[in-house]
Regions:
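Class I S-adenosyl-L-methionine
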Residues: 1-238
Length: 238
């Protein structure tokens, strides 16, 4: 089942989870870091050194027309946030309705290639954020931003994104782990280790349903796009 809109898109088959029905994920892809030329949508990118090996160039992201579309969308968000939020609200609502009409559970990932604190963005109709507006939609993201105010938001799951670029960022990794967050790690080789950071490693490339992962695990992801050549510490060699 496919879903296309101006902000979020879903393609491919819904993922079947035994005993829990089917899920379909819609993702919003913006231009990460400073690629839009008008703002920084990944505030921790330089500290974590992930801007050069960003997964933005993986898959269809390698095509110029895809990058141009992400830049246009990002500039829209940065220049006219009100109209962008109104459109995003409409698109989430349409996606939600289509999923329910087809007996599928809707999942939305707003930070496909960005790291924005969506918990701080009020929805045009007055809701505190999209998570409050759509309690029957499951949201999730990866993040490198510490101390995000998401405690108590039951339908928003965050996974911490690892980098060993420097000690300061590693301190944030340790804090995230102590806070009980799962840790996503990009490995250069697809043969993931059994354990990393004293956590068992699961294969995060098998599906995108991070909110269903067990607690206290490392989510292994294979390096894609520009990340294949990364030497900053963002991508891990075993």
């Amino acid at each position: 089942m496919n879903f296309q809109s101006k902000t979020i898109n879903a393609s491919g088959n819904a993922k079947t989870v035994k005993g829990d029905g089917e899920y379909l994920t819609a993702v919003m892809y913006l231009a990460p870091y400073k690629l839009s030329g008008e703002g920084n949508l990944c505030p921790m990118a330089e500290l974590a050194a992930c801007h050069k090996g960003c997964l933005n160039t993986a898959g269809r992201g390698k095509f110029d027309k895809i990058q141009e579309a992400r830049i246009r969308k990002s500039r829209w968000f940065l220049r006219d946030q009100q109209s962008f939020m109104e459109q995003l609200d409409k698109d989430i609502d349409r996606f939600r309705t289509k999923c329910f009409d087809n007996g599928v559970k809707p999942v939305v990932r707003l930070n496909g290639t960005s790291d924005i604190r969506w918990e701080n963005f009020q929805v045009p109709d007055g809701a505190a954020n999209f998570f409050e507006e759509y309690p029957d939609v499951q949201f999730y993201d990866y993040t490198k931003i510490p101390n995000r105010k998401v405690k108590g938001i039951k339908n928003y799951s965050l996974v911490w994104s690892y980098s060993a670029a420097n000690k300061k960022y590693m301190d944030y990794v340790s804090a995230a782990k102590s806070a009980g967050m799962n840790i996503a790690v990009v490995f250069r080789d697809e043969n993931f280790p059994r354990k990393f950071l004293n956590y068992p490693v699961i294969n995060g490339d098998k599906d995108d349903l991070r909110f269903l992962d067990p607690k206290n695990v490392v989510v292994g992801l294979k390096a894609k796009g520009a990340a294949k050549k990364d030497k900053s510490g963002f991508v891990v060699d075993i």
